[in-house]
From Swiss-Prot:
Gene3D superfamilies: MFS general substrate transporter like domains. This is Dipeptide permease D. GO terms for biological process: protein transport. InterPro entries: AA/pep_transptr_DtpD (IPR023777), Dipep/tripep_permease (IPR005279), MFS_dom (IPR020846), MFS_trans_sf (IPR036259), MFS_Transporters (IPR050171), POT_fam (IPR000109), PTR2_symporter_CS (IPR018456). CDD domains: MFS_DtpA_like. SUPFAM superfamilies: MFS general substrate transporter. It is a multi-pass membrane protein. PROSITE patterns: MFS (PS50850), PTR2_1 (PS01022), PTR2_2 (PS01023). One of its GO terms (cellular component) is plasma membrane. It holds the Pfam family PTR2.
Amino acid sequence: MKKASSQPRAIYYVVALQIWEYFSFYGMRALLILYLTNQLKYDDTHAYALFSAYCSLVYVTPILGGYLADKVLGNRMAVMLGAFLMAVGHLVLGASEIAPTFLYLSLAIIVCGYGLFKSNISCLLGELYQTEDPRRDGGFSLLYAAGNVGSIVAPIACGYVQEEYSWAMGFALAAIGMVAGLIIFLCGNRHFTHTKGVNKAALCARSFILPNWGWLLVLLTIAPLAIAVLFWQEWAVYALIVATAIGLAVLGKIYRQAENQKQRKELGLIVTLTFFSMLFWAFAQQGGSSISLYIDRFVNRHIFGYSVPTAMFQSVNAFAVMLCGVVLAWLIKESIGGNRSVRIWGKFALGLGLMSAGFSILTLSARWSAAYGHSSMPLMIAGLAVMGFAELFIDPVAMSQITRIEIPGVTGVLTGIYMLLSGAIANYLAGVIADRTSQSAFDASGAINYSINAYIDVFSEITWGALACVGLVLLIWLYQSLKFRNRPLAVGS
């Protein structure tokens, strides 16, 4: 007999697709900066610019992807189409080793696929439950854990295949993973018949000279080409400026629509959290760019005669997030009493403090490299693990606060704005920071020498920058704590 508490059968197909999507996305991401510098011979400045532009735009396109799913495609079709585009993009990226002109187009296709997939996979999962279904939270926890499994395995597998075979095979493995996830998902198609499908009436309705399905085909053709031009001409920053201006305008409109002081205070708290989260992720996203190149150039990666591929180090962060997340969920229970705002700022201070500690370890590693030529692998792993642990005190806290806001009908919009600023803008800032490590010179034989001092300076500055953020957050925390403590006295007087 089937237990009432068991999850719906369809969730396991969604989870399988999520695992393979994370495998595909993070497997490619672990290779990208190394591919640009080591294979295509981009200088660091050019590589950082393209890498940060790519990582920024993947947080912008989900806004359009969510709109298309709501109006025309439905979540299930949007997810399948997004998975297909990402698989195609990874295959084209592998071909760019032979024809570098495919590079910008492949990244653009992946960005479009990610936009259709990322904004709708969670919505599809939500469709599997009734509003008050007690299994809902467990389903989303399972989806989150599944993603971490994919992001742990991907850099190891893709890094190994790239090292042993070729760059094209590394990217092809990422594509194969996405195709495998899509096939598994399609095998469970019968379990999704109750979910929202394609809106055929909207798809066939005529707008101007074409039916909407015609406009959809035009969009799916033009969007990758337009994004490829943004990458090619390094115009992605202008797209970010436009998106940010729109996001801030919407935020201002929400603030004006707030009905009372409590709602405005809640919105102010979310804005402040978003600002500190943006800085946090500008520091944390060094992991895929400057830190990755530092490991490749200055860390002794040999163990028992085997050279550990640089891409594999990307798994450390994801493993730390998963392991520490399980431990925290077991050890920590949210207190019912006390001031929630005080607890929020305490967690943010801890997260930023751990980020500072992680970069202080990386600074020590870089100084070791300057003194002895190479740093040790355990020291590098320790720094990355601490940085991964720090993530648990930032995004979950901010997202929880957004879902609690009492202004009706704005949770989804605020989530999109949060992802725009803490994702897209933070990745752009991360590229600006990473570019400061791109100091190099040529020796007498014509070989390029990279400056370890540049890494020391940047890692040290991030350490102190994160620590300064901790100081600001602690001031806010202290103010909120004293304000809450004195409240009964004010009432009693």
